[in-house]
Amino acid sequence: MSEAKKYVMTYEGVKKLEEELEYLKTVKRKEITEKIKVALSFGDLSENSEYDEAKNEQAFVEGRIIQLENMLKNASIVDENEVPKDIVSVGSIVKVKDYEFDEEVEYIIVGSAEADPMNNKISNESPVGHGLIGKKVGDIIEVTVPDGVSKYEILEVNRA
């Protein structure tokens, strides 16, 4: 039997997932139960779009709860104190020079479960994140991305 996938996460990422799980189990489940009760009061279920919608939402929420529980059960939390501060790892804030666009960009390296590219939180499994892991200030990396190859120079490494 294969081993369950480990989800590399920071303490902050685990906390956010725990909060989402708690919200879904306590607040969202109750809301959906109420929606189902109201929809059932309309009678005939064969053409009851409110009931169908509530049941679909319930299925989605229950699926997300299972997903979150699995991620938390298989979380591998990175202790940022165990990694040298000058080496890029999960939990690092990295300022790089992007040679393609001739600009400085700051990324926060996180586990895949925490990735949020719109807020510059990139996964350690993404091409750029993977390329930065283990590197230090002054290192230049080339990363294959969908548009070709991007070149970055590491300018700063800090901890979140």
Curated annotation (Swiss-Prot):
Protein name in UniProt: Transcription elongation factor GreA
Record's signal peptide: none
Function noted in UniProt: Necessary for efficient RNA polymerase transcription elongation past template-encoded arresting sites. The arresting sites in DNA have the property of trapping a certain fraction of elongating RNA polymerases that pass through, resulting in locked ternary complexes. Cleavage of the nascent transcript by cleavage factors such as GreA or GreB allows the resumption of elongation from the new 3'terminus. GreA releases sequences of 2 to 3 nucleotides.
InterPro entries per the UniProt record, alphabetical: GreA/GreB_C_sf, TF_GreA/GreB_CS, Tscrpt_elong_fac_GreA, Tscrpt_elong_fac_GreA/B, Tscrpt_elong_fac_GreA/B_C, Tscrpt_elong_fac_GreA/B_fam, Tscrpt_elong_fac_GreA/B_N, Tscrpt_elong_fac_GreA/B_N_sf
PANTHER family named among the record's database cross-references: TRANSCRIPTION ELONGATION FACTOR GREA
Keywords for the protein's UniProt record, in alphabetical order: Coiled coil, DNA-binding, Transcription, Transcription regulation
Chain coiled-coil ranges: 14-76
Pfam family, one: GreA_GreB_N
Organism expressing this protein natively: Clostridium botulinum (strain Langeland / NCTC 10281 / Type F)
GO biological process terms held by the UniProt record: DNA-templated transcription elongation; regulation of DNA-templated transcription elongation
Gene Ontology molecular function terms on file: DNA binding; RNA polymerase binding
UniProt xrefs under NCBIfam families: greA, PRK00226.1-2, PRK00226.1-4
Gene that specifies this protein: greA
Family note: Belongs to the GreA/GreB family.
